[in-house]
Curated annotation (Swiss-Prot):
Classification via PANTHER family: 40S RIBOSOMAL PROTEIN S15A (PTHR11758)
InterPro entries according to UniProt: Ribosomal_uS8, Ribosomal_uS8_CS, Ribosomal_uS8_sf
UniProt keyword list: Ribonucleoprotein, Ribosomal protein, RNA-binding, rRNA-binding
Protein name stated in the entry: Small ribosomal subunit protein uS8
GO biological process per UniProt: translation
Role played: One of the primary rRNA binding proteins, it binds directly to 16S rRNA central domain where it helps coordinate assembly of the platform of the 30S subunit.
GO cellular component: ribonucleoprotein complex; ribosome
Family affiliation: Belongs to the universal ribosomal protein uS8 family.
Signal sequence region: none
UniProt-listed Gene3D superfamilies: 3.30.1370.30, 3.30.1490.10
Species, as recorded: Chlamydia felis (strain Fe/C-56)
Length: 133
């Protein structure tokens, strides 16, 4: 499994594809950044749960996807904003409200990876990683 240069875009694509295929979970290589993002998505109810496994000194993550009672994916859209080729930084005042506030933004800040409402409350901006709704 080759790591792409943009592991966040890869994470979002893998979740998107797994949801389309109605899979229960998706396995991928672990990174601290990926786990931070997944933790936020789980906290907001977009993912069911996740596990981190270690085999032969290689860490992988298993992300369990979340579906509604009628088996529709809870996540409608995952959008990568900042990219390695074009970084996007926003001050606290410019953190977007996503999908009538039903979605979330995820930022990398000086205080770690935060969702938009937390960053806004702390009055800190950062790199706008992705939007989820």
């Amino acid at each position: 499994m080759g790591m792409t240069s943009d592991t966040i875009a890869d994470l979002l694509t893998r979740i998107r594809n797994a949801l389309k295929a109605e899979h229960l979970y998706v396995d991928l290589e672990h990174s601290k950044m990926r786990e931070s993002i997944v933790k936020i998505l789980k906290h907001h109810g977009f993912l069911a749960r996740y596990l981190v496994k270690e085999e032969n000194r290689k860490r992988t993550m298993r992300i369990f996807l979340q579906y509604s009672d009628d088996r529709r994916p809870v996540i409608r859209q995952l959008k990568r904003v900042s990219k390695p080729s074009r970084r996007v930084y926003v001050p606290a005042a410019k953190i977007p409200y996503v999908f009538g506030n039903m979605g979330i933004s995820v930022l990398s800040t000086s205080q770690g990876v935060l969702d938009g409402s937390t960053a806004r409350a702390k009055n800190i901006g950062g790199e706008l990683l992705c939007l989820v709704w």
